[in-house]
């Protein structure tokens, strides 16, 4: 399977016209025999890509004191303190804008009740509620992991779509990333990857190539 995927990635890159930006590579997977009316079949999983996403990820860190300082030093895109949380709670348009602008949210454990109160209504429906972490956590480690993480979800159709890399990565690197997704499907689908009906790859602006 890995060789088949590598060949498909090569074809996708060859058929994609040069652009003035680095294009992402996306995978689309359709699934057989998945009753999405059953909540347990609506996949919502995080996948750590071994070679990274190939694209920047925006991460907001909700913390106070030393943890907030460390998060800022580690390169968090935004650090939100308790005072800012309360301000966002009074400004729903700004809170929605924040929710749409960031890929991941992380929050100091003892701030989670405040987060739930002020940001829960906008983050919850977007499946972006923060991961709680203790004040002693290492922000650099957390940020590094999240920058290589994607979310795969099945909502109202038995389809998964996600970024798996960028055109400046090698075929092998993209294939390894897709293998990581396949591993998650193997663990979460009743019949594993045998339930995959079809898989497609494409660059941001390029044509679609069928893999299987």
From Swiss-Prot:
GO terms for molecular function: rRNA binding; structural constituent of ribosome; tRNA binding. SUPFAM superfamilies: Ribosomal protein L1 (SSF56808). GO terms for cellular component: large ribosomal subunit. It comes from the Archaea. Keywords: Repressor, Ribonucleoprotein, Ribosomal protein, RNA-binding, rRNA-binding, Translation regulation, tRNA-binding. Belongs to the universal ribosomal protein uL1 family. PANTHER family: 54S RIBOSOMAL PROTEIN L1, MITOCHONDRIAL (PTHR36427), LARGE RIBOSOMAL SUBUNIT PROTEIN UL1M (PTHR36427:SF3). Part of the 50S ribosomal subunit. This is Large ribosomal subunit protein uL1. It comes from Methanosphaera stadtmanae (strain ATCC 43021 / DSM 3091 / JCM 11832 / MCB-3).
């Amino acid at each position: 399977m890995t060789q088949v995927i590598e060949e498909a990635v090569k074809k996708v890159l060859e058929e994609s016209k040069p652009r003035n930006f680095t294009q992402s590579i996306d995978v689309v997977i359709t699934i057989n025999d998945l009753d999405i009316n059953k909540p347990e079949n609506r996949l919502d999983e995080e996948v750590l890509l071994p070679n990274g996403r190939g694209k920047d990820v925006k991460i907001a860190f909700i913390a106070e004191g030393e943890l907030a300082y460390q998060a800022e030093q580690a390169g968090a895109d935004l650090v939100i303190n308790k005072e800012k949380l309360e301000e966002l709670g009074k400004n729903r348009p700004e809170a929605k804008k924040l929710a749409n602008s960031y890929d991941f949210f992380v929050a100091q454990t003892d701030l989670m009740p405040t987060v739930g109160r002020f940001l829960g209504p906008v983050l919850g429906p977007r499946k972006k509620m923060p991961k709680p972490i203790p004040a002693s956590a290492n922000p650099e480690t957390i940020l590094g992991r999240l920058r290589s993480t994607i979310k795969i979800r099945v909502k109202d159709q038995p389809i998964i779509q996600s970024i798996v890399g960028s055109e400046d990565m090698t075929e092998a690197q993209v294939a390894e990333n897709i293998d990581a997704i396949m591993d998650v499907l193997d663990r979460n689908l009743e019949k594993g990857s045998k339930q995959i009906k079809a898989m497609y790859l494409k660059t941001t602006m390029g044509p679609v190539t069928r893999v299987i």
